[in-house]
């Protein structure tokens, strides 16, 4: 079985390949990856590199023997390690490399999201290799994506990539844990990601990075829902990249969905973090799901959480615990508590101001039912 062709790809390199023994950057696994990227670019294909490993690369400069390191020291490790890591990547390519460090808050803000997209597109147009990483030196917990598997999926969506390659020290997805079962079989192709696939993912098998197989499956779900074929491959094996260049599938391919969601809907669903919930009645639920309507104040039963205008919220039926939609709210939680259940035309008369007609406009709403 041959791999689907692609024009633009995101390639994520895990910490276990950057600094396998945590004594600084090693070229052992990076050179074959760099050769693969060079070959792809010579063929006219575009690549965005998402490179983990700044903390692992910088660890050698600090006197910490154990894995548990204070947060402030990890940030310092990241600061020095990122510089070393970029130095290596820059030496591997004839054309320039560009460093982009970002946090989840950069991706959650729509204006910054679009700005990052434009910057990446301009870099690719000028044959410059973008090297992306999370800004571990500055990010706080609430600002972090948390792992570069999911970050790579967000970047792949942002640049409208055709393929996402997640390179780690894992051969792919298996039908059971290969560390426990010597007869475990690798799954070459996954057509649909569901709970059965997540049940196979288990936990992390890398001693260096923050992501395991589950985060890779999460990333694959994000990417495939936007029409991006996603591969999990072993970057420690040089033959992996020879196989990819020949159009073969050396790891596990998660096939793109045939009906991908739009870039904005994907951003709503997978990037924005919900700050509260809006409970709606049966009439509003039906209007949202069956008619693709906007959410109006008259259908709101209750409001939970403390959110501001422009925040993302979940919408769920007052009779169920499962969320039915996610969207950007045009009112704060405090404002909604005063207008919930009110007809739009009654709000102006009662409160003395002309209201925004839609609490959540349908263009800012993503239905989650059956997701």
Swiss-Prot record:
Q: Which cellular compartments is it found in? A: Cytoplasm
Instruction: Spell out the reaction equation it catalyses.
Output: L-glutamate + ATP = L-glutamyl 5-phosphate + ADP
Major localisation: cytoplasm
One GO molecular-function entry = ATP binding
PROSITE patterns according to UniProt:
GLUTAMATE_5_KINASE, PUA
Listed A to Z, the keywords are: Amino-acid biosynthesis, ATP-binding, Cytoplasm, Kinase, Nucleotide-binding, Proline biosynthesis, Transferase
Supply one GO CC term from the record.
Answer: cytosol
As recorded in UniProt, its EC number(s) are 2.7.2.11
Record: residues binding ATP = 12, 168-169, 210-216
A biological-process GO annotation:
L-proline biosynthetic process
Q: Where is the PUA domain?
A: 275-354
Q: Which NCBIfam families match?
A: proB, unchar_dom_2
Q: Could you say which protein family the record assigns here?
A: Belongs to the glutamate 5-kinase family.
Cited function? Catalyzes the transfer of a phosphate group to glutamate to form L-glutamate 5-phosphate.
Q: What is this protein called?
A: Glutamate 5-kinase
What gene does the UniProt entry assign to this protein?
proB
């Amino acid at each position: 079985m041959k791999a689907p062709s692609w024009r633009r790809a995101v390639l994520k390199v895990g910490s276990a390949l950057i600094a396998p023994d945590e004594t600084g950057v090693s070229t052992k696994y990076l050179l074959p990856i760099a050769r693969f990227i060079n070959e792809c670019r010579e063929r006219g294909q575009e690549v965005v590199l998402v490179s983990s490993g700044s903390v692992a690369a910088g660890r050698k400069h600090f006197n910490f023997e154990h894995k548990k390191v204070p947060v402030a020291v990890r940030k310092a490790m990241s600061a020095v390690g990122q510089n070393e890591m970029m130095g290596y990547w820059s030496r591997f390519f004839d054309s320039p490399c560009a460093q982009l460090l970002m946090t989840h808050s950069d991706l959650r803000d729509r204006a910054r999201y679009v700005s990052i997209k434009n910057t990446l597109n301009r870099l690719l147009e000028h044959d410059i290799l973008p090297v992306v990483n999370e800004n571990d030196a500055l990010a706080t917990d609430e600002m972090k994506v948390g792992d570069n598997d999911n970050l790579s999926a967000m970047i792949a969506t942002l640049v409208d990539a055709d393929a996402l390659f997640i390179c780690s020290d894992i051969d792919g997805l298996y039908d059971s844990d290969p560390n426990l079962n010597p007869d475990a079989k690798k799954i070459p192709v996954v057509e649909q990601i569901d709970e059965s696939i997540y049940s196979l993912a288990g936990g992390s098998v890398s001693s260096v990075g923050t992501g395991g197989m589950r985060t890779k499956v999460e990333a694959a779900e994000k990417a495939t829902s936007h029409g991006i074929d996603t591969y999990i491959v072993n970057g420690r094996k040089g033959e992996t990249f020879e196989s990819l260049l020949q159009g073969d599938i050396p790891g596990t391919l998660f096939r793109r969905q045939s009906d991908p969601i739009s870039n904005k809907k994907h951003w709503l669903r997978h990037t924005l973090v919900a700050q509260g919930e809006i409970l709606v009645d049966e009439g509003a639920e039906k209007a949202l799901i069956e008619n693709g309507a906007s959410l109006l104040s008259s259908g709101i039963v209750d409001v939970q959480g403390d959110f501001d205008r422009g925040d993302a919220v979940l919408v769920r039926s007052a009779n169920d615990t499962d969320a039915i939609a996610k969207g950007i709210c045009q009112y704060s939680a405090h404002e909604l508590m005063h207008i919930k259940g009110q007809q739009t035309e009654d709000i102006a008369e009662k409160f003395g101001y002309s209201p925004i007609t839609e609490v959540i406009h349908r263009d800012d709403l993503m239905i989650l039912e059956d997701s």
